[in-house]
């Protein structure tokens, strides 16, 4: 079972693809620098789970550049 639930994650970030890429980037950061934790308590022991918890809590947002939407 996914914790946090997918509907809680999609309330913060609408795209499942952006959730996955944002969580992966943040998980790498947590793995390389464990002292960068943003929450006082985590339910997950793994970096990806911790990243998903941060997304669900609204601590992490993806940075979308203007070229993502085809604008220059």
UniProtKB/Swiss-Prot annotation:
Promotes RNA polymerase assembly. Latches the N- and C-terminal regions of the beta' subunit thereby facilitating its interaction with the beta and alpha subunits. Keywords: DNA-directed RNA polymerase, Nucleotidyltransferase, Transcription, Transferase. The lineage of its organism: Bacteria, Bacillati, Bacillota, Bacilli, Bacillales. It comes from the Bacteria. This is DNA-directed RNA polymerase subunit omega. It catalyses: RNA(n) + a ribonucleoside 5'-triphosphate = RNA(n+1) + diphosphate. Its EC number is 2.7.7.6. GO terms for biological process: DNA-templated transcription initiation. It holds the Pfam family RNA_pol_Rpb6.
């Amino acid at each position: 079972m996914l914790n946090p639930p997918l509907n809680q994650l999609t309330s913060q970030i609408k795209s499942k693809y952006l959730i996955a890429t944002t969580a992966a980037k943040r998980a790498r950061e947590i793995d390389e620098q464990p002292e960068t934790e943003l929450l006082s308590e985590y339910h997950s022991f793994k970096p990806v789970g911790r990243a998903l918890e941060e997304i669900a809590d609204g601590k992490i947002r993806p940075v979308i550049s203007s070229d993502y939407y085809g604008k220059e």
